[in-house]
Amino acid sequence: MSTALLDAVVKKNRVRLIPFMLALYVLAFLDRSNIGFAKQTYQIDTGLSNEAYALGAGIFFVVYAFLGVPANLLMRKLGARTWIGTTTLLWGFLSAAMAWADTEAKFLIVRTLLRAAEAGFFPGMIYLTSQWFPQRNRASIMGLFYMGAPLALTLGSPLSGALLEMHGFMGHPGWFWMFVIEGLLAVGAGVFTFFWLDDTPEQARFLSKQEKTLLINQLASEEQQKVTSRLSDALRNGRVWQLAIIYLTIQVAVYGLIFFLPTQVAALLGTKVGFTASVVTAIPWVAALFGTWLIPRYSDKTGERRNVAALTLLAAGIGIGLSGLLSPVMAIVALCVAAIGFIAVQPVFWTMPTQLLSGTALAAGIGFVNLFGAVGGFIAPILRVKAETLFASDAAGLLTLAAVAVIGSLIIFTLRVNRTVAQTDVAHH
């Protein structure tokens, strides 16, 4: 009876929270990656150099690295609704402000402020998931959330491409309208957050008293099985550092490809970045949608975290590397494999810290791991450009990213993860 009721509660939470979280992630990812679509014409119009573009794409992550931990602790203190709603409003306005960043200095300043506003969003979403869903459901729940990335790049690619075609409307370039319109969408979502989100299950307006009690008791029982709830213990735990390094390698693969993908696809097609290239750019993200649905569900069903994550990241590395060596059609196929790999690995990966940590340690630990991811995002475009310049080859940059992803997969294989927890949970499903 309690198992059936708990499943019903999880379903209610999923219906209430996942579409909301997914929509926010779509907007966040779109605002974060739309600079890739603007790159070609934006650089021509503003005179922005390749080095400044790479620095701007990378510096976006520096502030994030420093603010991730305190942002998550602030969310724990202030409440999810206030924190997520406020930060979403801020990043929406700042994303729109990119439309007026027509010099290198303005570009770097706005990108830095935008990342500061976004710093608490993603780790906050991971923490929010741990407060609303039992351990046995988290990979598939995170998989649904992570579909926001391929959705943003599937729907957002044609959207961004179409907005770029507005060049000349009211005397402004296409990238101006892309930044303004996509930024204001996030502003609207921030306002909606204040009316929709509850801070904790105890405050949930859509759950009965019995449902709240059952969920709270289930989550409390899982907390008792975790290694630590203190931040100091978390930072002394070797597995936390392993997770942080792994996440760095994942983000190198992700952002080393995403920031340059529209340009890479346009080069494969022999055209400029516009609507046609943007539609083709969406193909890998359509593939990633299916992978992000299936792979985390398989992980939840089997209770297998480590091997699923390692093999998925390995596939991403192989796909990235081959995309620079094959014919245009096969290169698109390789990019599909890469996108499936580096998107689908992340929801499986994030079950590991939520299985290991609890309380304040979990909030700060997620921020700590995400800090390393921010470092990965910072160095990724710089690493790719440096490799391309050093070897005078676009393929060299892709092979460098691939090598980092393969190293990450090998580290995952060495990680000790308590598979029994997931298996036990599945057995009770």
Curated annotation (Swiss-Prot):
InterPro entries associated with the record: MFS (IPR011701), MFS_dom (IPR020846), MFS_trans_sf (IPR036259)
Miscellaneous comment in the UniProt entry for this protein: Part of the rhmRDTA operon involved in L-rhamnonate utilization.
Provenance organism: Escherichia coli (strain K12)
Membrane spanning residue stretches: 17-37, 55-75, 82-102, 144-164, 175-195, 243-263, 275-295, 325-345, 362-382, 395-415
Keyword Cell membrane: yes
Main localization of the protein described in the UniProt heading: membrane
Keyword Iron-sulfur in record: no
Membrane topology recorded in Swiss-Prot or TrEMBL: Multi-pass membrane protein
Location of the protein in the cell: Cell inner membrane
Name this protein carries in UniProt: Inner membrane transport protein RhmT
Topological domains annotated Cytoplasmic: 1-16, 76-81, 165-174, 264-274, 346-361, 416-429
GO molecular function: transmembrane transporter activity
Family to which the UniProt record says this protein belongs: Belongs to the major facilitator superfamily. Phthalate permease family.
Record's keyword terms, sorted: Cell inner membrane, Cell membrane, Membrane, Transmembrane, Transmembrane helix, Transport
One GO cellular component term: plasma membrane
Periplasmic topology ranges: 38-54, 103-143, 196-242, 296-324, 383-394
Gene assigned in the entry: rhmT
